[in-house]
């Protein structure tokens, strides 16, 4: 958890022109960390914004509340069922990394944004990327 000005400043913008200094930044290591962050923020009326790769060009990853950066630790493939052709992942996994792993099994995630080398699945889902 970071509340210093330099750390907050790094999260004050994304790939857009928008800039907002957040109250703080949380970098969770587990889903339980995310749950605890949201519970505490709700208790204090602080808005929460999840952030993946920060590739949004419309400002969806900036706000004046807490930024929850899922891209650092929540990047794993949780389950892969090649027979059913399904994969369950954590929100911080980068699309290109996911597809490198899936390629070994003859699979791929068929969404192709120009930012695939940096865009996370969580961010893509939040923005309805296709």
Sequence positions of predicted segments:
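Conserved PLP cofactor-binding pocket of PLP-dependent enzymes
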Residues: 51
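Conserved oxyanion/phosphate-binding beta-strand-loop segments in alpha/beta enzyme cores
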Residues: 1-12
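Active-site beta-loop-alpha junctions enriched in small/polar residues
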Residues: 6, 114-116
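Short glycine-biased active-site loop of nucleotidyltransferases that positions the nucleotide triphosphate
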Residues: 14-17, 57-62
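N-terminal glycine-rich flavin-associated loop
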Residues: 16-48, 66, 70-114, 125, ...
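Beta-rich nucleic-acid/ligand-interaction surfaces
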Residues: 118-122
């Amino acid at each position: 958890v970071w509340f210093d000005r330099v750390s907050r400043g790094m999260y004050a913008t994304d790939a857009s022109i928008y800039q907002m200094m957040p109250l703080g930044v949380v970098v969770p290591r587990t889903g339980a960390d995310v749950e605890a962050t949201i519970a505490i923020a709700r208790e204090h009326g602080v808005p929460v914004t999840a952030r993946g790769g920060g590739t949004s060009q419309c400002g969806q990853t900036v706000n004046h509340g807490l930024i929850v950066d899922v891209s650092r630790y929540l990047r794993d493939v949780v389950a892969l069922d090649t027979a059913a052709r399904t994969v369950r992942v954590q929100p911080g996994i980068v699309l290109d990394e996911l597809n490198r792993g899936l390629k070994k099994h003859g699979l791929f995630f068929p969404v192709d944004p120009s930012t695939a080398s940096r865009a996370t699945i969580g961010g893509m889902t939040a923005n309805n990327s296709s």
